[in-house]
Amino acid sequence: MPKPASSPTSFEAAVAELETIVQQMESGQLSLEDALARYQRGVGLLKFCQETLSGAEQRIRQLEGGELVELRIDTNADGSQECA
Protein backbone atom coordinates (compact mmCIF):
# COMPACT_ATOMS: atom_id res chain seq x y z
CA MET A 1 0.00 0.00 0.00
CA PRO A 2 1.52 3.38 -0.98
CA LYS A 3 2.34 5.78 1.81
CA PRO A 4 0.13 8.89 1.95
CA ALA A 5 1.56 12.00 0.32
CA SER A 6 2.66 14.76 2.63
CA SER A 7 0.97 18.13 2.77
CA PRO A 8 2.57 20.86 0.67
CA THR A 9 4.80 23.29 2.54
CA SER A 10 3.33 26.37 0.84
CA PHE A 11 0.86 27.59 -1.76
CA GLU A 12 3.71 28.03 -4.24
CA ALA A 13 4.96 24.48 -3.63
CA ALA A 14 1.45 23.13 -4.22
CA VAL A 15 1.09 25.04 -7.50
CA ALA A 16 4.51 23.83 -8.66
CA GLU A 17 3.59 20.23 -7.86
CA LEU A 18 0.25 20.63 -9.66
CA GLU A 19 2.09 21.89 -12.75
CA THR A 20 4.36 18.84 -12.64
CA ILE A 21 1.37 16.51 -12.30
CA VAL A 22 -0.35 18.13 -15.29
CA GLN A 23 2.80 17.71 -17.41
CA GLN A 24 3.13 14.06 -16.38
CA MET A 25 -0.50 13.32 -17.16
CA GLU A 26 -0.41 15.17 -20.49
CA SER A 27 2.66 13.17 -21.55
CA GLY A 28 0.53 10.06 -21.88
CA GLN A 29 3.36 7.95 -20.45
CA LEU A 30 1.69 7.04 -17.14
CA SER A 31 -0.01 3.76 -16.44
CA LEU A 32 -3.68 3.97 -15.51
CA GLU A 33 -2.82 3.31 -11.86
CA ASP A 34 -0.15 6.04 -11.80
CA ALA A 35 -2.46 8.50 -13.59
CA LEU A 36 -5.21 7.86 -11.04
CA ALA A 37 -2.77 8.31 -8.14
CA ARG A 38 -1.51 11.59 -9.60
CA TYR A 39 -5.07 12.76 -10.25
CA GLN A 40 -5.96 12.01 -6.63
CA ARG A 41 -2.88 13.93 -5.44
CA GLY A 42 -3.83 16.81 -7.72
CA VAL A 43 -7.33 16.99 -6.24
CA GLY A 44 -5.80 17.22 -2.76
CA LEU A 45 -3.39 19.93 -3.88
CA LEU A 46 -6.22 21.87 -5.51
CA LYS A 47 -8.21 21.72 -2.28
CA PHE A 48 -5.16 22.96 -0.34
CA CYS A 49 -4.74 25.87 -2.78
CA GLN A 50 -8.42 26.81 -2.62
CA GLU A 51 -8.37 26.78 1.19
CA THR A 52 -5.18 28.85 1.24
CA LEU A 53 -6.67 31.43 -1.13
CA SER A 54 -9.89 31.54 0.86
CA GLY A 55 -7.93 32.17 4.05
CA ALA A 56 -5.95 34.94 2.38
CA GLU A 57 -9.18 36.55 1.13
CA GLN A 58 -10.63 36.45 4.66
CA ARG A 59 -7.53 38.14 6.07
CA ILE A 60 -7.70 40.82 3.36
CA ARG A 61 -11.38 41.43 4.14
CA GLN A 62 -10.49 41.91 7.80
CA LEU A 63 -7.76 44.38 6.88
CA GLU A 64 -10.15 46.29 4.61
CA GLY A 65 -12.92 46.47 7.21
CA GLY A 66 -14.97 43.62 5.80
CA GLU A 67 -15.10 45.00 2.28
CA LEU A 68 -13.14 43.48 -0.57
CA VAL A 69 -11.38 46.38 -2.30
CA GLU A 70 -9.98 46.09 -5.81
CA LEU A 71 -6.23 46.66 -5.94
CA ARG A 72 -5.16 48.44 -9.10
CA ILE A 73 -1.53 48.02 -10.16
CA ASP A 74 -0.04 50.50 -12.59
CA THR A 75 3.02 49.67 -14.67
CA ASN A 76 5.46 52.54 -15.06
CA ALA A 77 7.39 53.32 -18.24
CA ASP A 78 10.48 51.63 -16.76
CA GLY A 79 8.51 48.42 -16.16
CA SER A 80 8.24 48.84 -12.40
CA GLN A 81 4.85 48.49 -10.78
CA GLU A 82 3.08 50.43 -8.08
CA CYS A 83 -0.26 50.15 -6.36
CA ALA A 84 -2.71 52.91 -7.15
Swiss-Prot record:
Highest classification ranks of the organism: Bacteria, Pseudomonadati, Pseudomonadota, Betaproteobacteria, Rhodocyclales
Name the record gives this protein: Exodeoxyribonuclease 7 small subunit
Enzyme class: hydrolase
Gene for this chain: xseB
Recorded family membership: Belongs to the XseB family.
Subunit details: Heterooligomer composed of large and small subunits.
PANTHER family in the cross-refs: EXODEOXYRIBONUCLEASE 7 SMALL SUBUNIT
Any GO molecular function: exodeoxyribonuclease VII activity
Native source species: Azoarcus sp. (strain BH72)
SUPFAM superfamilies per record: XseB-like
